[in-house]
Amino acid sequence: MIIDAHTHIFPPSVNEDRDAYLQRDTTFRELYSNSKARVATAEELLASMDEAGIDKSVACGFGWSDAELCREHNDYLLETAERSGGRLIPFCTLQPADKAARDDLKRWSARGARGLGELRPMSQGYSLIDSDEADLLSWAGDAYDLVLMFHASEPVGHAYPGKAGLPVEQLGRFITDFPGVSVIGAHWGGGLPFYALIPEMRDAMGRTYVDSAATGLLYSPDVFSRVIDLVGASHVLFGSDFPLVGQSEALEALRDVPLDEEARALIEGENARELLRLADG
């Protein structure tokens, strides 16, 4: 089973009235003010999966600052996932500072949400260190068995729109504070795997994964072997970051990486299947 653990879809209204959404959210404006920045629907994702030979995809929300935009987006994610016959796995978006967040989480979980993401604490205006928002997110992970996906930012290298998301020090602190919560550090965790060499970090990272989303835009292909050496293939998830990167392109790039058969199977889908408690086949 091949599972893309990191894709994004939006309701059709977002593309149809993009200017209105650009005015309502600073981070959306940063990422999508360029008309060439693609906004994809569920139908486009499913067509891409068919073309690439991908069985299932995690369909992520966007880190809106406005809780009402989160709700609007999540309704679409959950409705389209339900219609997909299990091919789309919904990760809802959340503004944890909103007073109705706990009620929203209960409702979304009942409708089939499997995780929260891609969360962007910096642009959404909260910290993961000693904060009510961190406590709420850990509670959501425990209470509803939700996987938390964070947009983790590498602290060095070139700048690009939307880079700010979550500094690696905050991600590391959240993991050590709440080691029982399942976490995905997107984009190779912003360098998090290196810190698995610290014994107390390694001890806390048993339920922590990193994904390969947008690898070709950030790292050389050697990142796969280096991260496997640091945390093991069992903690790496294949992710494309569709539609920013095409799924066929991302999968072909992964298959160009020399991996043993077991590591390839884990990264291409077995890790995600186990993490998300999906049935075989």
What is each PLM-predicted segment?
Residues 114-115, 127-237:
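Catalytic pocket-lining loop regions of alpha/beta-barrel enzymes
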Residues 14-19, 71-72, 103-104, 160-163, ...:
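Short aromatic-enriched loop/helix-cap "lid" or pocket-rim segments at secondary-structure transitions
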Residues 55-56, 64-156, 218:
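Active-site gating/metal-coordination segments in enzymes
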Residues 40-46, 73-78, 101-103, 167-171, ...:
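Alpha-helical scaffolding within the catalytic cores
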Residues 7-9, 61, 92-96, 117-121, ...:
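A cross-domain feature marking catalytic cores of carbohydrate-active enzymes
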